[in-house]
Amino acid sequence: MREVNFSIPNVNKASVNITTTLYDRRALDCTSTLPLINSLNHLAYLTTSSARIRDILTVDGGIERLVCILKEGRSRDLMEMWKWSLAFQCVVNIGVRGSESVRTRVVEADMVPVIATILDNYIKVVDKARARADSESQRQSSRHHSKAVPTSNDASGRSSFLEQSSTAEQRTSRRHAPPPSIEIPPQPFFQENHVADSNVLDVASPPRVPMTSPPERSTFGQDVHHHRTNEGRFAHGNHRHRMQPLATALPSMDAADGFGLRPVRDNERLPSMLPGFHTGLTSQPDSPTTPNAPVQPRSSAQATIARQRPSLRQQQSASGESDDGNGDGSTMDEDPASTEAAEPIVGLQNRMDIDDVGERDTILGGVSDSHDLTVTDPSEEQEAETFNITHRSTVDGSMINTDNAQNNAALGLSPTQAADNANSPALVPSPYSLYFRDRTTTAAHGVLTTMPRDEDVLMSLQLLAYVSKYCNLRSYFQHSHFVPKLKIDRELQMLEEGTSPIDLPEEEDEYLLPDDVNIFPLVEKFTVRHHSKDMQYWACVVMRNLCRKDESRGGIRQCAYYKCGKWEEFQRQFAKCRRCRRTKYCSKDCQKAAWVYHRHWCHTTP
């Protein structure tokens, strides 16, 4: 048998590969990156469309080989990243679209540690970005506060001075007669100065716009007139009279108004009256192919405001959305009497009410303060029920054809512009990737290339939602570990400012690590509002699967508090949460401790 890397020059590919019509297990053992990417690209399509291929992968060791590719870790090399993403996509396709036996094989192939590491890395990056953003905002606010105190005093002094001066000017204008209007010189004088004015007329100026400011602004800067001679004033006034008659710019007023009209010089105009400012405020076309205009000076301030996000407590008070799968948190102030009357809970001698939980204000206050977010979540405005499991290629502002995107997702196509993902914005850029992208350090870009994408987290949560509903597999989720080669602790350590890079301890072999990681607490963190709604939805599905009864053990349930894990000795031994009637707790202490995160996925049952 020939080597799997043996190439055929006339077709420029490996001799053993996977196509859309042929599956060969030997192609997955290829050690060359490029032919392996080609095979994985076609395998992604096959795992999406063919149930037979998914079944074959569970018995020929294909799933184990794909998981081994994932455990090798993500690299900064473009081709390696592409290979890793395609292998991950294949495993997700097998687990999501496969049968119960196929999903069981995915879990038994040790895919849960890979998912746990991806979720843990994302949480660490989120916490790092939020911590740095909070520290910078506090530093800027303290600096702004120190500068704002003297500025406010000076501003108040200047404003009082201006008010007094304006009052004095108004009183003076009431007492004295209005100043005489400027007379236009006779025609012979204009002819004598025609040569001098012709030089001024040679300079083309933009068309003047009608002045919409009140007539009082025409007297602004009267002290400038004292520095000019009468001849210059007449010549300038005559020039303005020829270029733009004042009668066309201002509405006509009678002589009884109290003052006459005179031309307005450019140095007397307010900034809002200058033609250059009006031309700069013209609306730009909204065509996606038209390049944007240069950023105005105030756009940076607007961008800063746009990238800020209200805290979790403010969102709870301002949000009017329902408490469904989108993941909006619920409060504990509702009276559950009506809910109990509609569907009473049976077999509960030690009934526990959510409203009876003590010290709820302290718990909720601590959670709200600890989950404030200072970065924007761009996916909140999207109401997508599905997601594209392929790479999201970079865009330049042009319109996206949704039909083509869906076809690419079905075919498992990969992008050709993935090389720019670390430096250019994606279709829906993560707020945390935007935060690190603004940092031009090498460490920040290293985190960008190794950190999980939003698509990776979303696919991980979706895969967990499909495989976690089988109670016989729950031990795989509650006793797992992290993959050493997938962890990004070294990259996160390099982000610390003012600290020298330290050598982290050498990575241990994975088989030596204890299975002491429970994946459900990691998933529960994605039910908090500052994550996207899709992440909240699938995380809530996973947490509700934790509350399923185990029919193989007589229909008993497990305590929903992850640190407890106690099982019922008989049916209906534990009390249900009175609000959602899904979770069960063995005691009030477990219920109070679990409410910190359970409140984010505790949805009222109709």
Curated annotation (Swiss-Prot):
Residue numbers binding Zn(2+): 577, 580, 598, 602
Acidic residues composition bias: residue spans: 321-337
Chief site of localization: cytoplasm
Cellular location(s): Cytoplasm
Skewed-composition ranges (Polar residues): 149-170, 280-316
Pfam families to which the protein is assigned, alphabetical: zf-MYND
InterPro entries in alphabetical order: ARM-type_fold, MYND-type_zinc_finger, Znf_MYND
Cellular component, GO, one term: MUB1-RAD6-UBR2 ubiquitin ligase complex
Keywords on record: Cytoplasm, Metal-binding, Sporulation, Zinc, Zinc-finger
GO biological process per UniProt: establishment or maintenance of cell polarity; positive regulation of flocculation; sporulation resulting in formation of a cellular spore; ubiquitin-dependent protein catabolic process
Compositional bias ranges of the Pro residues kind: 178-188
First and last residues of each zinc finger (MYND-type): 561-602
Protein name: MYND-type zinc finger protein samB
Source species of the chain: Neosartorya fischeri (strain ATCC 1020 / DSM 3700 / CBS 544.65 / FGSC A1164 / JCM 1740 / NRRL 181 / WB 181) (Aspergillus fischerianus)
Gene (name only): samB
